[in-house]
């Protein structure tokens, strides 16, 4: 096993522990708490994949961080902070919409890279909007927290989320997953649009009809693989 993979996991475990202690003191905001819950699932998945105990990894990560801090000067810290782009949290959904349980009469599931796509294939002839909560850096989508598909009546009929065992994804992964979800829902004569906020940060533009500017290759994939793959 690559030593960098192990040490990265160890550092992530310790940093999660620090953030959890901070949250336990009721000092974290909603995006901070969302990341803690998401990262906890990710760490559990990585622990199983790597075969490494989380508690032992947390202790090892603490030693790595302590060594780095001992070698870090205040000036170097200022330079590193200045070079990192500031992320911000964008919310299409309310906390209630994010946390609400939902059920599928005809469940369908597909994996697109590190993202899981779920939809209810019993949904017919509905007007559907895709809404998401995500982080943004340099005015582009950075990390998808959660995407859900809502009917005009407010029912949840689809979702895109991260796989805990495969952390990390790109904006292209998100756009591909959205294309698959749209294709699956449109197969049953539903009309699907993407929120203007999500269009703007994922594609850099927004259309009034709610249809993102998918590349021709992706349009062909949406049209030709939905029935067999989703």
Swiss-Prot record:
A motif (Nuclear localization signal) lies at residues 34-38. It is found in: Host nucleus; Host cytoplasm. Its main location: host cell. One of its GO terms (biological process) is symbiont-mediated suppression of host gene expression. Residues 223-230 are annotated as: PABPN1-binding. The keyword Ubl conjugation applies. Upon interferon induction, ISGylated via host HERC5; this results in the impairment of NS1 interaction with RNA targets due to its inability to form homodimers and to interact with host EIF2AK2/PKR. Belongs to the influenza A viruses NS1 family. Inhibits post-transcriptional processing of cellular pre-mRNA, by binding and inhibiting two cellular proteins that are required for the 3'-end processing of cellular pre-mRNAs: the 30 kDa cleavage and polyadenylation specificity factor/CPSF4 and the poly(A)-binding protein 2/PABPN1. In turn, unprocessed 3' end pre-mRNAs accumulate in the host nucleus and are no longer exported to the cytoplasm. Cellular protein synthesis is thereby shut off very early after virus infection. This is Non-structural protein 1. It comes from Influenza A virus (strain A/Gull/Maryland/1824/1978 H13N6).
């Amino acid at each position: 096993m690559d030593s960098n993979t192990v040490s990265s996991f160890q550092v992530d475990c310790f940093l999660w522990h620090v953030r959890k202690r901070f949250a336990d003191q009721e000092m974290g905001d909603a995006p901070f708490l969302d990341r803690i819950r998401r990262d906890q699932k990710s760490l559990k998945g990585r622990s199983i994949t790597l075969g490494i105990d989380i508690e032992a990894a947390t202790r090892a990560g603490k030693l790595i961080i302590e060594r780095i801090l001992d070698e870090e000067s205040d000036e170097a810290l200022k330079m590193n902070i200045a070079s990192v782009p500031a992320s911000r949290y964008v919310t299409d959904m309310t906390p209630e919409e994010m946390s609400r349980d939902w059920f599928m009469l005809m469940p369908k599931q597909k994996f697109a890279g590190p993202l899981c796509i779920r939809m209810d294939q019993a949904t017919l002839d509905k007007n559907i909007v895709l809404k998401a909560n995500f982080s943004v850096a340099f005015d582009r989508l950075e990390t998808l927290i959660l995407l859900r598909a809502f009917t005009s009546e407010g029912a949840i009929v689809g979702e895109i989320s991260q796989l805990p065992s495969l952390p990390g994804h790109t904006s292209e992964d998100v756009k591909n997953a959205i294309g698959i979800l749209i294709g699956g829902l449109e197969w049953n004569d539903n009309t699907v649009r993407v929120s203007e906020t999500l269009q703007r940060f994922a594609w850099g533009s927004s259309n009034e009809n709610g249809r993102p500017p998918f590349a021709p290759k992706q349009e062909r994939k949406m049209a030709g693989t939905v029935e067999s793959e989703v």
